[in-house]
């Protein structure tokens, strides 16, 4: 499958699911959180649209992404959904751009790069959540 031919929201849909698995694995295996209520609370720090949007700002400022990934992000971010242009919509669009990157890389079977981005992401969230 050629991910560049897919709608950016489809890439984001897939990327959201893939990213969620990486974060759940991190919380259970690395952080050793095992109580469902604690897992749910911890997951919010990592999978929220606000966290993803904040990470993307940092990633762009620090050069953590390739030119190709930035182009995928912009494509995913700029895909028009329904609704007014308010702060919540803008954050959601930025989050969709991040998820589109993950979905695109997954379809290209670039799992090492996904892990690298997720590792940057986890460190960024852990540093910024307090």
Language-model-detected regions and their locations in the chain:
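Double-stranded RNA-binding/processing signature
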Residues: 1-130
């Amino acid at each position: 499958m050629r991910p560049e031919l897919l709608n950016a929201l489809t890439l984001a849909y897939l990327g959201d699911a893939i990213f969620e698995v990486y974060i759940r694995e991190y919380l259970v295996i690395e952080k050793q959180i095992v109580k469902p209520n604690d897992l749910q609370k911890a997951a919010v720090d990592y999978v929220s649209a606000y966290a993803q949007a904040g990470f993307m700002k940092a990633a762009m400022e620090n050069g953590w992404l390739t030119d190709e990934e930035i182009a995928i992000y912009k494509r995913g971010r700029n895909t028009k959904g329904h609704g007014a242009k308010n702060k919540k919509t803008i954050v959601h669009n930025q989050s969709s751009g991040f998820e589109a990157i993950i979905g695109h890389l997954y379809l290209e079977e670039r799992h090492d790069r996904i892990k690298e981005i997720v590792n940057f992401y986890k460190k960024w969230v852990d540093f910024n959540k307090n």
